[in-house]
């Protein structure tokens, strides 16, 4: 179960939620019938199917969440700029094209955007374990992801030079709460907004893109096998 799916489904009384720390463990649970289905964001579900034979996505969308950025509590000016940018971005051809790539049955293809390097600095917390939103491309060794595309488009329009601080999602979430950087990207979801507002550890931007939560299940136990690394 992915983080967004966890928020969206934990309150449901008609299902029993079991959490796994790795995709490999989750697939093993499916294989040995410890669970009936796995819930996750559609883009990540596509990637899992590209790594494991014998699984399928159940087409019905079980929930819809929104992608957001987490913003330093001291940077209300930045929050306002991001929300202004997102209002335009949501209606743009760039957003439509990115959404299509994220939800492609072939899997997400990263399109690198060069940072124009403006006269203002923007420090960005970047999880390297949040595929397809932010991660390290193991072929090039560079940062990649859909959130990286979006923050770079924003930075170029508003005159920022990007400075990245990498880490796993947990450390990035802690870091933005402690004011270590201006903004954090990489799979922050609108479903967590209430918790963020109550704890007051950071602010959340408006939603810039919706995403679907879907189930995956075993289609054929006889052909179930890993064909490429999962985690």
Regions found by a protein language model. Give the residues of each.
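Short amphipathic alpha-helical coupling segments at ligand-binding clamshell hinges
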Residues: 74-88, 146, 226-231
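Acidic, polar ligand-binding/catalytic clefts
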Residues: 1-3, 42-64, 73, 148, ...
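Surface-exposed aromatic
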Residues: 63-71, 131-136
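Sec-exported extracytoplasmic/periplasmic mature domains
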Residues: 10-14, 31-35, 50, 74, ...
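Ligand-binding clefts/hinges and TM-proximal coupling segments of bilobed small-molecule sensing domains
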Residues: 4-20, 53, 57-61, 83-121
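Residue-level recognition of oxygen-bearing side chains
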Residues: 25, 44, 94
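Residues that mark the start of a beta-strand
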Residues: 68, 121-123, 217, 231
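Extracytoplasmic small-molecule ligand-binding "clamshell" domains
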Residues: 1, 7-8, 12-28, 37, ...
């Amino acid at each position: 179960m992915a983080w967004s799916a966890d928020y969206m489904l934990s309150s449901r009384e008609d299902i029993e939620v079991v959490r796994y720390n790795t995709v490999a463990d989750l697939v093993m649970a499916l294989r040995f019938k410890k669970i009936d289905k796995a819930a996750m964001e559609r883009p990540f579900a596509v990637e899992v199917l590209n790594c494991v034979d014998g699984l399928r996505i159940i087409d019905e969308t079980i929930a819809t969440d929104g992608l957001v950025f987490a913003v330093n509590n001291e940077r209300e000016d930045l929050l306002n700029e991001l929300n202004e940018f997102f209002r335009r971005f949501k209606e743009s051809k760039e957003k439509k094209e990115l959404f299509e790539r994220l939800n492609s049955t072939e899997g997400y293809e990263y399109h690198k955007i060069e940072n124009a390097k403006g006269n203002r600095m923007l420090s960005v917390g970047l999880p390297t374990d949040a595929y397809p939103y932010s991660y390290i491309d193991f072929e090039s060794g560079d940062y990649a992801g859909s959130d990286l595309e979006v923050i770079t488009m924003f930075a170029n329009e508003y005159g920022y030079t990007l400075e990245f601080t990498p880490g796993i999602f947990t450390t990035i979430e802690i870091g933005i709460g402690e004011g270590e950087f201006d903004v954090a990207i990489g799979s922050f979801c609108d479903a967590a907004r209430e918790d963020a507002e109550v704890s007051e550890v950071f602010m959340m931007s408006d939603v810039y893109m919706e995403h679907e939560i879907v189930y995956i299940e075993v289609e054929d136990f006889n052909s179930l096998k890993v064909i490429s690394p999962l985690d």
